[in-house]
Structures are given as C-alpha cells and as structure tokens.
Regions:
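Charged interaction scaffolds used for protein-protein
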Residues: 1-13, 28-47, 63-113
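Active-site-adjacent beta-strand anchor residues
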Residues: 16
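Residue-level signal for threonine
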Residues: 19
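Short, residue-level hotspots on alpha-helical faces of the histone-fold
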Residues: 51-55, 59, 96
C-alpha cells in the first residue's frame, strides 16, 4: 500500500483516502451518484463538504488501521478550528484520487454524463 496523503486537522496529522468505500459512503450520505463526482466542486452544499471530508478521514484511518471514533460534527468543529483552507487541501487529494481511475472507469463515468 502506498503512503496515504495526510492533513493536519483535529490536532493531529490524519490520513485521507478516497477509494470506492469512501466514495460509496459519501454517495449514500449525500444522495448523489457516481455521475456527480466529476462536478463535485460545483454547488457543493456545506453538509456535503463536511461529509466528504469525514468520509476521506474515516477511510484514510481504516486503510491505515487507525481507530477513527469521530462524528461529522467533530469534523465540522475541526474545520471551524482550521479554516476553510482545509477543504481546499482535501479537494486536492480528492482530485488526485479521481485522476487515478483506470481508463475504463473514466470512460464509463463519462458515458453517464
């Protein structure tokens, strides 16, 4: 497993990961689908932004075998403490992870548009 990207949030340096488990959970929480992932930065509600960061942190911890016993409210409080710059950091990691999709996955995703 390659080393996961980490962000400083909640008083710690925490791993972030946006694999299919994280994206599946986020789609379920947000009510959005895979076809919406390409436009995620446009008109993203505040609650969806918080849940995206939450899912990335939760699954980064899972992949790193680190306990993650935090809620979305905890993550929202951390964002309050760190500022919205943390959202930009997470979006960069998210964008990088989407760039790692295979050509077949990209083609399938583009057909859904």
């Amino acid at each position: 497993m390659s080393e996961l990207k980490k962000i400083a949030i909640g008083g710690e340096l925490r791993p972030v990961h946006f694999g299919f488990a994280a994206l599946s959970q986020w789609c379920e929480l947000s009510g959005l689908g895979l076809q919406d992932l390409g436009n995620i930065g446009e008109n993203l509600s505040l609650s969806n932004a918080i849940s995206l960061i939450y899912c990335g942190l939760k699954h980064g911890s899972r992949k790193s075998k680190i306990d993650f016993n935090h809620t979305m409210d905890d993550v929202a409080d951390w964002i309050d403490d760190e500022g919205m710059g943390i959202f930009n950091e997470v979006m960069e990691i998210f964008t990088e992870s989407m760039g790692k999709m295979s050509p077949a996955e990209k083609k399938k995703k583009n057909k859904g548009k």
